[in-house]
């Protein structure tokens, strides 16, 4: 079934992408018959699939099914907008973004006002509800999630690219927190390090692909290559963009003059052979020609990129005249970005990555335009170095051949006497100093360019919708849906609290007050308690699932839990804890919350969960039973027969359900339930 759902999703997703492009094109360029045909097929698919998807999502949902519902609804609206009778010309998308504000209700009558304006707001709401899920009934949870899901559907639209105004990459999501927890935090919460993290999960960056040349290929495939040739002929000539400089003209000419005395009858020394080979292999270089100009021939890469955009726009107009008989006005023609804006949004024939690379090249060219830096760069060129060494060896060989008597060598480090020696030494020191300054400057330049280009690329790169928000919504919805399905089962109601139930509860409490828990088991019981207050988002299956305390810490860090609240959770169980510390003397009031703040309600309910964990463990030890405490959301709605045990439903009205051999009983008092379990003969729960 999941394969069929994925197949339907892929087809609807492809249609949504095409619709998002069509909304930005000139209506005259659209094939109305094809749009009508696709709209009819979409209506057919929606009539068959959408009602079933909604029924399925009311029982158990997935990120794929939730997004598919949104794509079906939004594609229907986009198709209707394309076929609107009064649609003329291109329409600029509205700048207004949807938002919603409502109150989230918790136990004790406490309400929290939330305002959702961004995709991050929805994701943050999921993390916060995940940390206090046990403070809400399934009705409260589903109502709060439904409003957020509706807003996410309006955010989703039909475009695979989310509106950049709807998300912030500097806010870590649930998966970012999980990645940060792998790194050492030196005792600090993961959210403290999250301020320096760029989230790539809400909006996933797309790997940059070459854009240059795609339009030209499409034109040639349409049989209009002559238009490109006409544009190339009209383009003014100039040096090739991005040419890398080699050794300068003086070095090349000097090497050529040094080789003029050799011919096929000459004896060729090794130095001459190496010099000739170097000139041969560099004969195709750009810098040994007649230009002698710097990198890029003195032209700006960014200006060349923008000029190419203008030239290809003219070619596109000529293609439209040849194919459609008239020039069309699309959205990117009606609202053309300026030079500065194009740095952020890219162009039709180039991406923002191309603009970043061109800007990086221009910055480097501007820095190296200084004559001193150019000289240093030239001397660092490998070909220049080898050429100079070969010429020096050749010069030394000629001098040794013509020298009659060797000169008396001077000691190392000695300089020629007189003003000329001092001046030569000063010039060498100056050259060495400038070389060192240039080397350090180039190193800093490369580091700065790499860092800034990485930041720009990460900020301006194309991003598509991620699945993390839909995944979180599906997890949280399934939690509350499973709870609703479980408490709605055909269980016998024992919440009345008649006189016999009070005596039964008193009997169990009296016996448990005289017992103690083994100190060796307290550590395991602490982790067991953590599993009952850990949110549904942390329920990850795999070969190496995280420990319960790590999963709980991730929930707290993601939700922004305060340190003193974390300390309260870790202090629920301590060494030497006695039954009188956790057993409540009241009757038939388990998981009841009086009015108060959310923080006080959270503490009361955590103590109630602690009471259930420790009491069941002490009960099994005292009477030799094997009652297992379970979570109600662990039972899927389609599961035929849940395993026996005591289920915590997190529902204030029906908090405890005992299952035994296919039968179930609903209790409001924990100890009356244990008394019923004690009466059962064959204990397999």
UniProtKB/Swiss-Prot annotation:
A zinc finger (C3H1-type) spans 173-201. InterPro entries: UL28/UL56. Residues 231-254, 394-423 are annotated as: Disordered. ATP binds at residues 619-626. GO terms for molecular function: ATP binding; zinc ion binding. GO terms for cellular component: host cell nucleus. Residues 395-407 have a biased composition (Basic and acidic residues). GO terms for biological process: viral DNA genome packaging. Keywords: ATP-binding, Host nucleus, Late protein, Metal-binding, Nucleotide-binding, Viral genome packaging, Viral release from host cell, Zinc, Zinc-finger. Disulfide bonds: none annotated. It is found in: Host nucleus. The keyword S-adenosyl-L-methionine does not apply. Associates with TRM2 and TRM3 to form the tripartite terminase complex. Interacts with portal protein. Belongs to the herpesviridae TRM1 protein family. Component of the molecular motor that translocates viral genomic DNA in empty capsid during DNA packaging. Forms a tripartite terminase complex together with TRM2 and TRM3 in the host cytoplasm. Once the complex reaches the host nucleus, it interacts with the capsid portal vertex. This portal forms a ring in which genomic DNA is translocated into the capsid. TRM1 carries an endonuclease activity that plays an important role for the cleavage of concatemeric viral DNA into unit length genomes. This is Tripartite terminase subunit 1. It comes from Epstein-Barr virus (strain B95-8) (HHV-4). The lineage of its organism: Viruses, Duplodnaviria, Heunggongvirae, Peploviricota, Herviviricetes.
